[in-house]
Amino acid sequence: LEDGTLVPLPEKNIDTGAGLERIASVLQKKKNNFETDLFMPIIKGVEEVLEIKKEEFDETVKIIADHIRATVFLIGDGVLPSNEGRGYVLRKIIRRAFGVGSSSKGKVFEKEDVFLHKLVSYVVNNMKEAYPELEEKREYISSYKMTSLNNYLNYEKNQLLKIANQLKESGYEVKEYI
């Protein structure tokens, strides 16, 4: 109460800290969160879009599935990549997902490597029943993701060019990949 008095709650509850994913894995008798129906459709999407198999790139596929899901929800809730706060966290999540996906294919940062926006529909289709607002924001999330990734790629490409030029000026031989 306002005066600091504690009053027992009408319902006695205990927060186990288990979370939705852990509860789903127990109820569905799965070994981990990524084998549940919360993640498997997204994992299948990662495999299709990147043309890789979870068995060969287990950690990569799990990271991308987890990060794309978080990204879709964050952008859907109005969080945009920025240099501070939640926006900074989102930016780091996007970069990590893109980075592990690109490295799994042995690719250099190129525009045609952008793939995360293609995974938005897998998340939305899987979660729209429980979160119908995701369906309403599908196009916005996907287009924002594409814009954000293109900006990131341009930044990274410029950074790589700077490093390559510095190495050349120092007498190192640098192969042209960009």
Tell what function each PLM region has.
Residues 1-92, 104-127, 131-134, 142, ...:
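Structured aminoacyl-transfer and RNA-binding surfaces used for tRNA recognition/handling
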Residues 97:
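Aromatic/basic-lined ligand-recognition segments
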Residues 100:
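Short alpha-helical functional segments enriched in proximate histidine and acidic residues
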Residues 177-178:
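Helix-hairpin-helix
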